[in-house]
Design a protein with these regions (language model features):
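Extracellular/periplasmic solute-recognition and catalytic clefts
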Residues: 1-50, 69, 73-74
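Short helix-initiation/N-cap motifs at beta->coil->alpha
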Residues: 1-6, 19-22, 147-148, 170-180
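Short, hydrophobic alpha-helical packing/hinge segments within bilobed ligand-binding/sensory domains
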Residues: 4-5, 23-24, 58, 71, ...
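Immediate post-signal peptide segment of exported/extracytoplasmic ligand-binding proteins
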Residues: 56, 119-141
Length: 188
């Protein structure tokens, strides 16, 4: 949070978990800045119980409109890498080595080239689903919170999906409401 960042800058705190996104460039190369591999995977969750997310081609189109390398390298300023499996770097296997080095014979579970941003293919998939240029699709709502990279990623999704004709409304929700909302399926 910005409050924690300010406290760190003033010397009140010795360490903070995250630097505000806009401050990362000023921290790179500093002795007191270190990026630790995150044990987790950043992903977009779609509610498959709601239309149009129950249509495979719509989900594929939304996926192909996302440039994962851009998200990881630019929006997240190199603090993430585009995922090749649901378990990202940092997970340790039983022998102490990195999980990804052993899992699936050391090969990625996913061929990321299949998931490379492809706006034309995404548009075709939407058309195949009955939504040429996004026509007929209702406005979609993406719920997120405003911590860390979430807001920046949500704004990117809004822009990326607009390129294929999808109108996305970004809804910022407090963590205290966000988690129960997700558990109850009250999201798109």
């Amino acid at each position: 949070s910005n409050a924690a960042y300010s406290a760190y800058q003033s010397g009140e705190l010795l360490m903070i978990k995250a630097v505000p996104t806009e401050e990362i460039p000023s921290f790179e190369g500093r002795e007191d800045y270190y990026v630790e591999p995150i044990i987790g995977t950043y992903y977009v969750s779609l509610n498959l119980n709601k239309e149009p997310f129950n249509i495979k081609e719509v989900r594929q189109a939304l996926s192909l409109a996302i440039d994962r390398d851009y998200v990881a390298g630019t929006l997240m300023q190199g603090t993430y890498t585009a995922a090749t499996s649901f378990m990202g770097p940092g997970w340790v296997d039983t022998d102490g080595s990195e999980f990804q080095a052993n899992a699936n014979g050391g090969k990625p579970y996913m061929d990321n080239s299949y998931f490379e941003a492809n706006v034309e293919k995404a548009k075709q998939l939407l058309a195949d689903a009955g939504y040429p240029n996004g026509e007929g699709l209702p406005q979609l709502t993406y719920s997120t919170n405003d911590t860390g990279y979430h807001k920046v990623v949500a704004e990117y999704l809004q822009q990326a999906w607009a390129e294929i004709g999808v109108d996305l409304k970004v809804e910022t929700v407090e963590w205290a409401s966000f988690t129960p909302m997700r558990r109850n399926g009250d999201y798109e």
